[in-house]
From Swiss-Prot:
<dbReference type="GO" id="GO:0043254">
    <property type="term" value="P:regulation of protein-containing complex assembly"/>
</dbReference>
<dbReference type="GO" id="GO:0000712">
    <property type="term" value="P:resolution of meiotic recombination intermediates"/>
</dbReference>
<dbReference type="InterPro" id="IPR011333">
    <property type="entry name" value="SKP1/BTB/POZ_sf"/>
</dbReference>
<dbReference type="InterPro" id="IPR036296">
    <property type="entry name" value="SKP1-like_dim_sf"/>
</dbReference>
<dbReference type="GO" id="GO:0000018">
    <property type="term" value="P:regulation of DNA recombination"/>
</dbReference>
<dbReference type="GO" id="GO:0000776">
    <property type="term" value="C:kinetochore"/>
</dbReference>
<comment type="function">
    <text>Essential component of the SCF (SKP1-CUL1-F-box protein) E3 ubiquitin ligase complexes, which mediate the ubiquitination and subsequent proteasomal degradation of target proteins. Controls sulfur metabolite repression, probably by mediating the inactivation or degradation of the metR transcription factor.</text>
</comment>
<dbReference type="GO" id="GO:0007096">
    <property type="term" value="P:regulation of exit from mitosis"/>
</dbReference>
<dbReference type="InterPro" id="IPR001232">
    <property type="entry name" value="SKP1-like"/>
</dbReference>
<dbReference type="GO" id="GO:0006790">
    <property type="term" value="P:sulfur compound metabolic process"/>
</dbReference>
<dbReference type="GO" id="GO:0031518">
    <property type="term" value="C:CBF3 complex"/>
</dbReference>
<dbReference type="GO" id="GO:0000278">
    <property type="term" value="P:mitotic cell cycle"/>
</dbReference>
<dbReference type="GO" id="GO:0017117">
    <property type="term" value="C:single-stranded DNA-dependent ATP-dependent DNA helicase complex"/>
</dbReference>
<dbReference type="GO" id="GO:0010458">
    <property type="term" value="P:exit from mitosis"/>
</dbReference>
<dbReference type="GO" id="GO:0061630">
    <property type="term" value="F:ubiquitin protein ligase activity"/>
</dbReference>
<dbReference type="GO" id="GO:2000766">
    <property type="term" value="P:negative regulation of cytoplasmic translation"/>
</dbReference>
<dbReference type="GO" id="GO:0043224">
    <property type="term" value="C:nuclear SCF ubiquitin ligase complex"/>
</dbReference>
Amino acid sequence: MAEKMLVMTSNDGKNIEVPRDVAERSLLIKNMLEDLGDPTEPIPIPNVSENVLSKVLEWCAHHRNDPPSSADDDDSRRKTTDIEEWDQKFMQVDQEMLFEIILAANYLDIKPLLDIGCKTVANMIKGKSPEEIRKTFNIQNDFTPEEEDQIRRENEWAEDR
């Protein structure tokens, strides 16, 4: 039996055909299909462009046979910033695409992909000074030296010793 296919339409009007089980890695899509049955029309994905949706669906296809995560998995996954090798390579994209993937994973309710995106960002920050973080993310420092000193004093407890 041939696998069931769905058509998803990105916010830039491009149709992407995808196996149903791949699309159902998104809880948003899975719940929608459970409520509505088999769609005869393309499923609009209004918040995601074609290139980002294609990238997200590539991740979903690679992870299509992963078991659903349990609450226990969530706890242990939250405590580590380790990322599997395939996922690390998958996340080697420019910053704009990385943030678009994170936003799409959040919108489409794909928690494992959202976790990997956030861990990738956490690893970009880990061990860096505020100045290095600003440089990495092109953030303008709008604090006066006095405000910076006050923030450092208030957050002394959080510094590595």
